[in-house]
């Protein structure tokens, strides 16, 4: 069974309440789709509420575990998209709220961590741009392995050294002081 989330579709908001609402609006349907596509396995399963995406995932995983259903593969595309938008918009306090304590995002990843630990999730594969968000979430989600740091994946995930160097040289020539600061950067 597969549940696929796409955080690139996350609609931004100026406060935590708006972000939570938008996060839940976006992420309730993927788990509901997984249940619908596997209705033969989920039989009489019903969500107790369809308000919180994390609670819905938790309930579906609990049912899967209790009834010996196949393990779930969780795919999250651009897991850091909206948090990166907060950082680039200089909304650091809001970013802090999203990635700390019992925020909607942190709770979501805690549910995934519990699902892996309890055996209802086989694997969670996340794609993203920067490891910043994952670093800030790791105390609650400390079961992640960042594949881009493995040499065998360098050409597959992210930029190669040569690609990054070429782009940096281009930016320095076009917008900076030339190649003088290349080695420093």
Each predicted region: which residue ranges?
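P-loop NTPase nucleotide-binding core
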Residues: 1-72
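A short beta-strand-to-loop transition that corresponds to the Sensor-1 phosphate-sensing loop
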Residues: 8, 77-78, 107-108, 112, ...
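Switch/connector loops and helix/strand junctions flanking conserved nucleotide-binding motifs
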Residues: 11-17, 82-84, 133-139
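Short secondary-structure boundary/capping segments
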Residues: 20-22, 88-96, 136-153
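Short, glycine/acidic-rich hinge or "gate" loops at secondary-structure transitions
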Residues: 39-51, 73-76, 118-129, 178-185
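Substrate-engagement module of ASCE P-loop NTPases
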Residues: 59-65, 94-122
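Conserved P-loop NTPase "ATPase switch" module shared by AAA+ and STAND
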Residues: 68-98
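Amphipathic alpha-helical segments of the small helical/lid subdomains adjacent to P-loop NTPase cores
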Residues: 133-140, 147-185
């Amino acid at each position: 069974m597969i549940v696929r989330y796409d955080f690139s579709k996350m609609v931004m908001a100026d406060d935590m309440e708006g972000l939570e609402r938008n996060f839940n609006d976006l992420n309730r349907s993927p788990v509901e789709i997984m249940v619908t596509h596997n209705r033969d396995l989920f039989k009489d399963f019903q969500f107790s509420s369809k308000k919180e995406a994390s609670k819905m995932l938790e309930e579906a995983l609990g049912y899967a575990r209790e009834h010996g259903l196949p393990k779930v593969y969780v795919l999250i595309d651009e897991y850091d998209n909206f948090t990166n938008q907060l950082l680039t918009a200089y909304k650091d306090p809001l970013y802090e709220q999203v990635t700390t304590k019992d925020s909607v995002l942190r709770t979501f990843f805690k549910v995934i961590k519990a699902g892996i630990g309890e055996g209802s999730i086989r694997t969670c594969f996340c794609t993203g741009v920067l490891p910043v968000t994952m670093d800030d979430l790791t105390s609650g989600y400390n079961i992640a392995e960042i594949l881009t740091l493995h040499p065998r994946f360098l050409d597959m995930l992210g930029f190669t050294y040569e690609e990054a160097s070429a782009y940096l040289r281009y930016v320095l020539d076009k917008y900076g002081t030339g190649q003088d600061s290349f080695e420093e950067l």
